[in-house]
Amino acid sequence: MISEIYSQFLNYPVISTDTRKIIPYSIFFCLKGEQFDGNLFVNQALELGAKFVVTENSSFTDHPQCFVVKNVLETLQILATNHRLELKIPVIGITGTNGKTTTKELITKVLSQKYNVQSTVGNLNNHIGVPLTILSITKEHEIAVVEMGANHVNEISELCTFAYPTHGVVTNIGNAHLEGFKSYENIVETKMGLYDAVIHDSGVLFVNGKDLLLVKEAKTRIETSFKKTGHNNTQIQFYGVDQDPFINGSVTAIDPYLTIQIFDQQIKTQITGAYNLDNILCAASIGRFFGVSDAQIIEAIQSYAPNNQRSQVKMLGNNTIIADYYNANPTSMKAAIENFMMINASEKVAVLGDMFELGDFSSDEHEKIVNLCNEFHLETYFIGTHFSHLKNDTTHFFESVDKFKSVFENMHWNKKTILVKGSRGVHLEKLFE
């Protein structure tokens, strides 16, 4: 059955999973979700122009445009694996606690100066998104950049069985999704699934030389592989260190845009956050490895402008908004606050939303953020039930963004620099609607 589906996929190489966004002559996969069951929309998909439908609905067994399978999701994943094995191009896998999407976009921007690049759309980085990304790669593409996310143990290793990365980047490892991982050690081991996959095929790892954990893990895992097999040709390209790195650089200003020194030049970017220096150096390192010129790398970095509520600078009247509310965890929240305090601005305010998926660690991690803001004497407005449990007389707490919005709209702030950060589920974007 898989071979038949793949044969048709080669003729109609577009996948659809949502009848509201169906593409004519695509193959519709009837995926199940918490709120929907695609198997209920077979006829609708065909009426809207799907060429074929992959479904678990046995009543369509004899339909000439339907493939009836036991498990649609597994079929999608196997199809992606088969397609990946037919591709003869570099596939760069990216994971990490923070910075995955920004790094992915920077790498794509840099490599696109020279190559036809396909990369993960948005943050489709899970057990559905990674197969869809692989299946979107065509024979015209020369390099693929695949983002991989995880919220439970061993998930990255699973995603690598679809992507088969030849090159790998772990941006960093911090506390996130602790509800699913249960411990920091489990987070480390899960992220290292990418290193293991690349090492297995003697690929190339791009490693932040300042991150001692990543350096140790990369070297140790290569040595372990060599002892087991007797051979391993995995390369490590270090970036961000002073001792003969592939690429290094430094932050020279944050106003709030980030200015960096790289290739003996000052470059002003369109993103904020000193923490983004590592992401830029990673992209530059990969660009140089693949033969992109330094001038092209600089052009790509300067022209990259985020529009995804990550490290984004906006204006609200004459106030400057640091919009970083796509997601949040303890590590990224701490980094955002510390970076915010480095910005050259006279009047600063922080609007911080809850951090989700922390399980039993939630109360302690939220309290650490409140204490950090108090240490900086930062005027802060905390939003969400997790922060509200820590309510005291000296800090501003609001149970929801809706309760804060009316207050926010009547602040009449003037020439303030405002950090807005929190988990997606807090819906901080409502403040600007």
Model-derived features: positions:
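Acidic, Mg2+-coordinating active-site environments of NTP-dependent enzymes
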Residues: 55-63, 169-320, 345-346, 367-379, ...
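N-terminal leader/targeting and accessory segments in enzymes
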Residues: 1-78, 82, 272, 341-345, ...
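Peripheral docking tails and interdomain loops at the edges
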Residues: 397, 416-433
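Phosphate-binding loop of NTP-binding sites
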Residues: 74-205, 209, 213-232, 263, ...
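ATP-dependent carboxylate/acyl-activation modules
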Residues: 94, 308-310, 425, 429-430
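Active-site beta-alpha connecting loops in nucleotide-dependent enzymes
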Residues: 31-36, 307-309, 325-394, 423
